[in-house]
Amino acid sequence: MQICGFNKTTLLDYPGHVAATIFTGCCNFRCPFCQNGDLVLHPARLPQLDEEEVLKVLAKRRGILTGVCVTGGEPTLQPDLAVFLKKIKELGLLVKLDTNGYRPEVVEDLFRQGLLDYIAMDIKSSPEHYAAVAGFPGLQMDRIRESAAFIQGCGLPYEFRTTVVRELHRAEDFLSI
């Protein structure tokens, strides 16, 4: 697991829970407003945290923490994400996944393995402007729709969220999201 950041306690990232937040490196989008740009563009320049050390901290904080938010970057790009989430679940912690939704097959697989308890998906813009706002020419909107439909139907708590940028969004965009 490429872990580039670790917040030991958050009251914001996982609604209703005292949680830790784990930041993974890399992303397949290039949103110009990304708050974690270094995770996306230069993850190798950031300190890489040892997975086992992070798990030890989580284990010590059981009883304080009830969950872990795994965010990025884009966590679904991590080839060993499922193995890592299993280790978190073995600690008795709930898992919230933050995703851009471009890899619906990964989200569905993690759900089917019982590794997710909450999903948050960013909706970047209206379908007409999605590729431009996500910085992803050639973006396949069907992948976004597939993730959104799956998340809505899977039975887990979820949220969809949009970062509003005056220079990139119009009022009409929100009507077609």
What is each residue range found by the language model?
Residues L55-G67, T76-I177:
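Conserved AdoMet/S-adenosylmethionine-binding subsite of the radical SAM
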Residues F23, T71-G73, R161:
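A secondary-structure boundary/capping signal
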Residues M1-V18:
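Short, charged low-complexity linear segments at domain edges
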Residues G37-V68:
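Conserved alpha-helical substructure of the radical SAM core
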Residues A44-P47, G73-E74, K96-L97:
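Short, flexible loop segments at the rims of nucleotide/cofactor-binding pockets, characterized by
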Residues G16-L49:
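Canonical Radical SAM [4Fe-4S] cluster-binding loop centered on the CxxxCxxC motif
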Residues L39, G73, K124:
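Flexible loop residues that form catalytic
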